Amino acid sequence: MRKYIIMVFGDMEAQYILGLSYYRGEGVEINSEQGVYWFEQAANQGDADAQYYLGVSYANGEGVVKNYKQAVYWYEKAANQGHADAQNNLGVCYEFGKGVVQNYQTAYFWYLLASANGIEKAKDNMDRIAQDLSPSQQIEIQNRATRWFENNNGR
């Protein structure tokens, strides 16, 4: 047991897996608070999956008090590492003004990245708000996304 505890306290992947186990109730009883605790440990070391799940936890109020500003904070950390689901969820926050000032251009940007990273619903989300953007705005955002991919190793 001591070896296991030492491994978990130092290893962000093990921390993330333990958080996910508590969050989903896999091998242990569901305990959202414990899930959030372990996600925080891994997220603070830079684990994008843990950052994403912290965002989900804050957005849904699971294991923590619902707080969209915190959800956006964690989604943004994960999204900037190329986490496609976080990119889509960040787009949702910007589209509907959850935790941020509503901004269709920023929402479109994050949906575009998520779509390029394989999230099918992001394309639908992007199409939905495209009608509120001019063609020149869409082109500008597409160029920004291209630069983002170039600067982030295609993630």
Predicted regions: what they are:
Residues V8-D11, Q15, R24-E26, N31, ...:
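Short helix-capping/linker turns of helical repeat alpha-solenoids
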Residues E120-R155:
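Terminal, low-structured helical/coil segments at or just beyond the last alpha-helical repeat
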Residues Q15-R24, Y53-N60, V64, N89-F96, ...:
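Hydrophobic face of amphipathic alpha-helices that form TPR/SEL1-like repeat modules
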